[in-house]
Amino acid sequence: MKIATNRLNAFSDGVFAIIITIIVLGISFPSTFDSAHLIPFFWEIFIFLQSSLVVGSFWYMHSHLLDGYEYVSINTAVANIFHLIFLALLPLFSRGIMQHPTEIFPTIGLGIIVLLAFASYSAMSMTIASYSDRSVRISSFICWPISIIIAILFAFIST
């Protein structure tokens, strides 16, 4: 069974947009504009920017991966769904970091979610490589997870 790439892209683009929207809706606007309220507000803006960059990076990689294909296999579609499921959890942990900036659990949870999203993206890449002439660069699959694992380890060290 084959699925039209434009349908897969349309669905995925909608999910990516909803994820960023949910993250921005999690930002609490300050009730007063003194430093006690503005510092947490700017922290939430910072977390929103970081999370949006992660989502935007995955969106770019996703659109680039599917570029040039008219149809994809059902295995690619399933890997794509898992990819979106993991990314859909990103707003939850982003909000956790916004609400509890000194706690380690939301930070580690976010790192694990990004690792799982990257693993599912890698699976999607490999399913496409299995029926196309494109090669999969292993080096691109090593850099992201290593940097995320290092970031998670630094979260343990910093507490």
Language-model segments: residues:
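Multi-pass alpha-helical transmembrane bundle typical of ion/small-solute transporters
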Residues: 1-159
